[in-house]
């Protein structure tokens, strides 16, 4: 077996995909140790960088390839109640969630590379974006529109592709 292929395949079999990231939910009620313990036994994943147009059905179809999905909670803008680019996927077992971390993290859905991370477990209210404008905090630091997320960027890109003048 070639060196590169062997390295790639052994990487898929490693536990590095299932390690807990450095991110910690600042709204978690409890100590850092309790949060870390919760993350290590959790069967819930945070899924970020979703298109605003990605549907729950698309999430179900993709994530069910790794096991039985218990529920999906789509992230919503807390003011407009529209999708804002993230969701929570809860599996029945930790093993199925680990498969999703290993095989789905970094894949493309709706022309966007999605990222997954462990979540200590969904609690009511967490489905709403935490940014001041209702969406995600991360979106508030963007300097221009994200084409994959919709808004004027999507319209302008389509007009450029069709060589039509943009009207604002």
Swiss-Prot record:
One of its GO terms (molecular function) is snRNA binding. InterPro entries: NCBP2 (IPR027157), NCBP2_RRM (IPR034148), Nucleotide-bd_a/b_plait_sf (IPR012677), RBD_domain_sf (IPR035979), RRM_dom (IPR000504). Residues 43-121 form the RRM domain. Keywords: Cytoplasm, mRNA processing, mRNA splicing, mRNA transport, Nonsense-mediated mRNA decay, Nucleus, RNA-binding, RNA-mediated gene silencing, Translation regulation, Transport. SUPFAM superfamilies: RNA-binding domain, RBD. One of its GO terms (biological process) is nuclear-transcribed mRNA catabolic process, nonsense-mediated decay. GO terms for cellular component: cytoplasm; nuclear cap binding complex; nucleus. It comes from the Eukaryota. The keyword Nucleotidyltransferase does not apply. It is found in: Nucleus; Cytoplasm. CDD domains: RRM_NCBP2 (cd12240). MRNA binds at residues 23, 46, 115-119, 126-130, 136-137. Component of the nuclear cap-binding complex (CBC), a heterodimer composed of NCBP1/CBP80 and NCBP2/CBP20 that interacts with m7GpppG-capped RNA. Component of the cap-binding complex (CBC), which binds co-transcriptionally to the 5' cap of pre-mRNAs and is involved in various processes such as pre-mRNA splicing, translation regulation, nonsense-mediated mRNA decay, RNA-mediated gene silencing (RNAi) by microRNAs (miRNAs) and mRNA export. The CBC complex is involved in mRNA export from the nucleus, leading to the recruitment of the mRNA export machinery to the 5' end of mRNA and to mRNA export in a 5' to 3' direction through the nuclear pore. Belongs to the RRM NCBP2 family. This is Nuclear cap-binding protein subunit 2. It comes from Taeniopygia guttata (Zebra finch).
